[in-house]
Amino acid sequence: ILVNVLIGLGLLVLLALTFAPLESLGWWAREGADEAAATVQELAAIDSGPDDSAYDGYVVYLSGIGAVGGDSVPPEELPLIQNLSSRLTRLKVIHDVFPYSVSNNGLTAQRPTAAVWRWVEKLRFKNPETLAGMLINARNAMQLFVCADRRYGPAYNVGTAQEVMRALRRHGYPMGSGLPVTLIGWSGGAQISIGAA
């Protein structure tokens, strides 16, 4: 029985790895290529503008593989974000980008599998050591593999970079000001920040 369970788990992992790039490839085919071209044109047209920001720079934080959405930071990461915000008072710390989706669409947000991910998240809150909670980590790790893949990574990284830019705008970043932007991340978020840069 143990051998059958291990074979079944292996097949599930293989199947999940096979489907992992589909979100970013679907996004690229539907809208990503057009959005990327428009963004390049928009950025080329921006003149240096006045620095009318209340901050000396911006820090965009990308969560680790335990995240379920941009609006939900894993509890173990909160002290780091709070520490950054309290110590770097002249910098705006942004932490509402979900790095494991090219469209910043959290697992529990508007997607066909949202109910499943809400159930898994509820189990994880009740018992952080539950095997079901590891499904979130596994799913996000597979997106991390997509980010690092030479075939699918470029599309994934463009999508993430666009979401970072949208977050900067939402938080008042003056485009064309030349204010520094620093990307940092926890665990897989650090890897994805390299691709988005």
What label would you give each PLM region?
Residues 1-43:
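N-terminal membrane-anchoring alpha-helices
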Residues 27-28, 61-68, 77-176:
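Active-site catalytic motif of lipid deacylating hydrolases and related acyltransferases
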Residues 43-53, 173-175:
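Short boundary motifs at domain starts and secondary-structure transition points
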Residues 51-52, 74-77:
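Electropositive, gly/pro-rich neighborhoods at or near active sites that engage anionic ligands
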Residues 51-59, 179:
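A short, charged/proline- and glycine-enriched loop
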Residues 60-61, 183:
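Hydrophobic Val/Ile/Leu positions in short beta-strands of Rossmann-like dinucleotide-binding domains
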Residues 184-189, 193:
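Gly/Ala-rich beta-loop-alpha elbow adjacent to hydrolase catalytic centers
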Residues 197:
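The feature captures the conserved acid-bearing segment of alpha/beta-hydrolase catalytic domains
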